[in-house]
């Protein structure tokens, strides 16, 4: 009689596609510290010129081909986007395109440094002076200085992740009646990756 082997259920996996090095570093630290209940894979694909939309679809096809577990787990693919270099029309088009291909768009307005700043304070001012504000808490922080930035960023994430989630939720509540992404300033949707609930 053959021995029955009970397969352990596969752990869900998130693929995180991002534009820049700061985002890539951030989520590599999240992975290292095991702050998500799922496996995560991070890939930096650079800023996407939206006159060449096939690029991200190609990345998605490569993921589907290389990661067969995606079809067997409750896994998701996310694209982390800075909103400050796009028009509202481009953002709306991006969102439709990505969601049609089962990619969840998580944007920050104006950019990802807002996400980092929210670990340190509740910030509600319009503009994009996030690095200046971060440096009030962490004077040696720079936008991207390799290992030195990583050490500071790891400390911020390790000790202040709950604050970042709470502060981002407050911004969402503040802007709940606005439909335009660019009108929501400042705003970030990235915190939703830390929730098990459906991402809309």
Located regions from the model:
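C-terminal accessory helical subdomains adjacent to catalytic cores in phosphodiester-
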Residues: 2-11, 24-46, 62-78, 83-200
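N-terminal carbohydrate-binding/catalytic regions of secreted carbohydrate-active enzymes
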Residues: 49-60
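Conserved beta-strand elements of the Class I
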Residues: 13-17
């Amino acid at each position: 009689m053959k021995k029955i082997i009970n397969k352990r259920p596969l752990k869900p996996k998130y693929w995180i596609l991002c534009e820049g090095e700061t985002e890539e570093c951030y989520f590599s630290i999240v992975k290292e510290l095991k702050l998500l209940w799922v496996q995560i894979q991070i890939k930096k694909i650079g800023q996407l010129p939206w006159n060449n939309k096939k690029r991200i679809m190609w990345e998605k096809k490569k993921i589907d081909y290389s990661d067969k577990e995606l079809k067997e787990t409750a896994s998701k693919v996310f694209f982390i986007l800075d909103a400050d270099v796009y028009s509202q029309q481009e953002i709306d088009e991006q969102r439709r395109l990505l969601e049609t291909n089962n990619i969840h768009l998580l944007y920050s307005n104006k950019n990802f440094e807002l996400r980092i700043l929210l670990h340190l304070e509740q910030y509600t001012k319009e503009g994009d002076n996030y690095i200046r504000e971060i440096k009030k808490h962490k004077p040696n922080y720079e936008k991207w200085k390799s290992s030195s930035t990583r050490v500071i960023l790891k400390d911020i994430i390790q000790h202040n992740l709950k604050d970042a989630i709470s502060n981002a939720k407050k911004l969402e509540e503040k802007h709940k009646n606005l439909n335009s992404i660019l009108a929501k300033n400042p705003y970030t949707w990235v915190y939703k990756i830390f929730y098990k609930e459906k991402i809309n």
